[in-house]
Amino acid sequence: MNSTHHHGMYTSLHLWNRSSYGLHGNASESLGKGHPDGGCYEQLFVSPEVFVTLGVISLLENILVIVAIAKNKNLHSPMYFFICSLAVADMLVSVSNGSETIVITLLNSTDTDAQSFTVNIDNVIDSVICSSLLASICSLLSIAVDRYFTIFYALQYHNIMTVRRVGIIISCIWAACTVSGVLFIIYSDSSAVIICLISMFFTMLVLMASLYVHMFLMARLHIKRIAVLPGTGTIRQGTNMKGAITLTILIGVFVVCWAPFFLHLLFYISCPQNPYCVCFMSHFNLYLILIMCNAVIDPLIYALRSQELRKTFKEIICFYPLGGICELSSRY
């Protein structure tokens, strides 16, 4: 998917010159065709080391999230299980991008006989990236639905969202997204695939917006109703609203990091020859960096918004001989 040294997903989707594969110069030539002055039309170069570094950071951070949720029984709740699914998706997107950079860099030094093998490897990695993107969208939507149930069906929530049902939902999400991701790459010759991806992204945004408008408009009313009941209803609802706010932040970061990529696809479909659209598309590598940054930022959001998760992070880190870090973290 990284087009610094190859066209990645766009080779599969035929967004760049179909006859060229693997070199940054070819990408620039494809974009700059008909624009001899180059400039904005030249493909923005990003060092492969940047992709690899972000991939490694994302891998370590998201593994920490997954291990923390598995380790701490207090985090064995539907919301955190969905967060775990989101962490896996983020990790796969970022690591696949970094891995693809390494593979293509190595294969570019070989002769043309390895080109077909390069394409096959690239298609496999792109399938993983596409599947993980769909899983990210579905995981975010699942977290939103979970927050909706905690706020509006607080008394019946534990009967509705059981661990078994959550496991089935997550399994179905990944099974469906894996099949869809593979099919999207196999049939990527058709523009309908790109339109489908764009439609799914914007449909998700509309669903999220609708859910949140209803959720936050009615939240105060339900908090007042729960408050009159015996027990700690107010505290519970406050916690639920905190979870909803956390999800709002996650969705905001997701939109900021992924929107340029989908705008890129939209411009390719709607105005591939327009100078402004071509100029926007020439920054494709920057949009890939933003996507990888999403996978790096999400674990930081989890840590900042959840004291329990923060505490578990410290316990895991302190398990290793990192006394200096533990001593520093104990002050906060």
From Swiss-Prot:
| Gene3D superfamilies in the record | Rhodopsin 7-helix transmembrane proteins
Q: What is this protein's function?
A: Hormone receptor that acts as a key component of the leptin-melanocortin pathway at the intersection of homeostatic maintenance of energetic state. Plays a role in regulating food intake: activation by a stimulating hormone such as anorexigenic alpha-melanocyte stimulating hormone (alpha-MSH) inhibits appetite, whereas binding to a natural antagonist like Agouti-related protein/AGRP promotes appetite. G-protein-coupled receptor that activates conventional Galphas signaling leading to induction of anorexogenic signaling in the hypothalamus to result in negative energy balance.
Q: Which residues are glycosylated?
A: N2, N17, N26, N108
Predominant location category: membrane
- Sequence ranges on the Extracellular membrane side: 1-43, 107-123, 187-191, 272-280
The UniProt record lists the keyword Transport: no
What are its GO biological-process terms? adenylate cyclase-activating G protein-coupled receptor signaling pathway; feeding behavior; insulin secretion; positive regulation of bone resorption; regulation of eating behavior; regulation of metabolic process; response to food; response to insulin
Kindly list the cysteine pairs connected by disulfide bridges. C40-C279, C271-C277
What is the name attached to this protein's record? Melanocortin receptor 4
UniProt family annotation: Belongs to the G-protein coupled receptor 1 family.
Organism of origin is Mus musculus (Mouse)
Where on this chain does Ca(2+) bind? E100, D122, D126
